[in-house]
């Protein structure tokens, strides 16, 4: 019988630490001026800690493709720097994905506002 978990599970703690460290590394460690202002929104880690998907957004949408290239190019460097900062048996391989949830949320909000504006007010 498994013991009930208290508080955060280890995977959640590791995920939060990876997110904090990567946010700092992206902010201070990426020297490529072509990259936009990057915000790390979420990190998902596999159960065996072999892979981590990093969801990010950027301030300048015009630099999205260039930022993807910069992150892909810096992936190995970011992973090695991450290994220096956190003590894990296995440092996950990093996969970067642009987080489209903010854009989808804004589009959905605009659609709701549009429907609300078109609907006549009933007394």
Curated annotation (Swiss-Prot):
GO terms for cellular component: cytosol. Signal peptide: none annotated. GO terms for molecular function: ribosomal small subunit binding. Keywords: Cytoplasm, Ribosome biogenesis. InterPro entries: KH_dom-like_a/b, RbfA, RbfA_dom_sf, Ribosome-bd_factorA_CS. It is found in: Cytoplasm. One of its GO terms (biological process) is maturation of SSU-rRNA. Belongs to the RbfA family. HAMAP family: RbfA. PANTHER family: RIBOSOME-BINDING FACTOR A, CHLOROPLASTIC-RELATED (PTHR33515:SF1). Monomer. Binds 30S ribosomal subunits, but not 50S ribosomal subunits or 70S ribosomes. One of several proteins that assist in the late maturation steps of the functional core of the 30S ribosomal subunit. Associates with free 30S ribosomal subunits (but not with 30S subunits that are part of 70S ribosomes or polysomes). Required for efficient processing of 16S rRNA. May interact with the 5'-terminal helix region of 16S rRNA. This is Ribosome-binding factor A. It comes from Neisseria meningitidis serogroup C (strain 053442). The lineage of its organism: Bacteria, Pseudomonadati, Pseudomonadota, Betaproteobacteria, Neisseriales.
